């Protein structure tokens, strides 16, 4: 029996800086988790003035793989993680917002779902890191 997908709208904001080589596998892993568990979601990729073709790699991935919306923000000057994530949050419309501060899943992608379950328990902020724990 297939489990019903969650109806909450999810926004996933990812910071990118010269990540052309790894952005496609990263987005594929995140999208696989979101697609498995959520009926509706959006991706927001914030390109922090990359010089290696990161923005084009995101566009190529979206054209070939996505059925859900993707917003690509391109910073004309390098802003750093915090300001870029704030810009991505400003665009997010989700009931829940995931923030990825690098295009690198250094933990089991299943923790994306576990973080959501933990948030539903009433936690305003849930953090996942490379120790494979949800706090």
Tell what function each PLM region has.
Residues 97:
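Short aromatic/hydrophobic "clamp" motif used to bind/position activated sugar donors
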Residues 1-32:
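N-proximal low-complexity "stem/linker" segments adjacent to membrane-targeting elements
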Residues 79, 103-106:
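Acidic metal-phosphate-binding loop of nucleotide-sugar-dependent transferases
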Residues 39-49, 73-74:
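Short beta-strand/loop segment that forms part of the nucleotide-sugar
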Residues 47-56, 104-105:
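A conserved acidic beta->alpha catalytic loop
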């Amino acid at each position: 029996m297939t489990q019903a997908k969650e109806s909450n709208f999810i926004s996933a904001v990812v910071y990118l800086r010269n990540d052309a080589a790894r952005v496609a596998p990263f987005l594929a892993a995140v999208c696989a988790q979101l697609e498995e568990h959520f009926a509706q979601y959006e991706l927001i990729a914030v390109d922090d003035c990359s010089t290696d073709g990161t923005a084009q790699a995101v566009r190529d991935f979206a054209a070939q793989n996505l059925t859900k919306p993707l917003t690509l923000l391109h910073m004309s000057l390098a802003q750093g993680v915090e300001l870029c994530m704030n810009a991505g949050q400003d665009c997010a419309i989700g009931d829940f917002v995931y923030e990825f501060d690098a295009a690198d899943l250094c933990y089991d992608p299943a923790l994306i779902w576990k973080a959501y379950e933990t948030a539903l328990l009433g936690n305003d902020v849930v953090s996942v890191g490379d120790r494979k724990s949800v706090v």
